[in-house]
Regions:
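C-terminal regulatory/interaction module of P-loop NTP-utilizing enzymes
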Residues: 1-148
Length: 148
């Protein structure tokens, strides 16, 4: 199902580089699932950030009449620990998921209606998570605003 997939957006082009030859590895689904479970145990999303996500959900409902839904929060709790295990940090994982799973839904709204609310959401994200901590969300919202 498309809304459960995690699309990879390639917005920039990096410089050409030579990738070293590496040995292939085989892994079973069971092993991979075990790694995901281990990530969830070792790097759960903090209660502080879960509360911030709940506050953001209320903000988006109040200003855009759009709710995250329990499935998105469940995905966030599974995705962010794996993101951390791959070398990212918690807020960066939250930023990525919000930008690609939640804000993408804004395209279905009446863009003229939400135009005046976008700057407020950018400011709210900065207040909630810290200045410069949600660059993916900010970039997406500013791109969306340009299309209006």
């Amino acid at each position: 199902v498309y809304d459960r997939a995690m699309p990879i957006a390639i917005d920039d082009k990096c410089e050409v580089f030579e990738a070293p030859d590496t040995d292939k590895i085989k892994t079973s689904y069971k092993h991979l699932e075990g790694l995901f479970e281990k990530s969830s145990e070792e790097h759960p999303v903090s209660e502080e950030n879960l509360e911030k996500i709940a506050q953001l959900d209320r903000y988006v409902i109040d200003h855009f009449r759009l709710a995250f839904g329990n499935r998105i929060v469940k995905q966030l709790k599974e995705f962010v620990p794996a993101f951390i295990d791959c070398g990212g940090d918690e807020v960066a994982g939250i930023d990525y998921l919000i930008a690609h799973k939640i804000l993408r839904k804004f395209e279905q709204l009446n863009l003229a209606y939400i135009k005046d609310e976008i700057d407020g959401l950018v400011n709210y994200l900065e207040k909630l998570f810290g200045t410069g901590k949600t660059p993916e969300c900010k970039a997406y919202l500013l791109r969306l605003k340009k299309t209006i």
